[in-house]
Regions:
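N-terminal hydrophobic/helix-forming segments and targeting peptides
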Residues: 1-153
């Protein structure tokens, strides 16, 4: 059974890992983090042309081999367009249900690897017409408000 120090170490590592942006197709930051963690444990890592990270650990050759694999990527969005009013239109990468999106906090990673916070815009319930109140907004109509006044911001 693991001791409290090991549990805390695993918890800290897991927290660090899930906070790294790793949208499908853009998992390099996650791969670099994992590679560093594994090298710190004196394990050799390699990467293939598809971006997969491979770590091999020598074991007892008389015992069966074990493989452990997991996704490094996350579901999310890519910026499709920035409107003249500064609102950001996005396109799906993965299968996030539309009904789960309204008013969610969003972190955008720009082309300089800087983080930009935003929120998925949502017409408030009390400002909605009766026929709008319980309709899920389509991804085509979803926008992110990151506080920009215009496209140039």
């Amino acid at each position: 059974m693991p001791n409290i120090k090991e549990v805390n170490s695993i918890s800290k590592t897991l927290e660090e890992l899930v906070l790294i942006s790793g949208l499908s197709g853009y998992e390099t930051n996650v791969k670099n983090y994992l590679s560093k963690q594994l090298k710190n444990k004196s394990l050799k890592t390699t990467s293939d042309v598809l971006g997969n990270l491979v770590c091999t650990m020598k074991g007892d050759e008389t015992l069966p081999s074990v493989i452990l694999f997991a996704h490094m990527d996350q579901l999310g969005f890519v910026v499709k367009k920035i409107e003249d009013n500064g609102f950001i239109r996005v396109e799906w990468v993965g299968g996030i249900p539309e009904k789960a999106l309204a008013s969610q906090d969003i972190v955008i990673v720009n082309n300089k690897n800087e983080l930009v916070r935003g929120i998925i815009g949502n017409k408030s319930h009390h400002a909605s017409q009766p026929d709008e109140k319980y309709i899920v907004t389509s991804i085509k109509n979803i926008y992110i408000d990151a506080g920009f006044k215009n496209k140039k911001d």
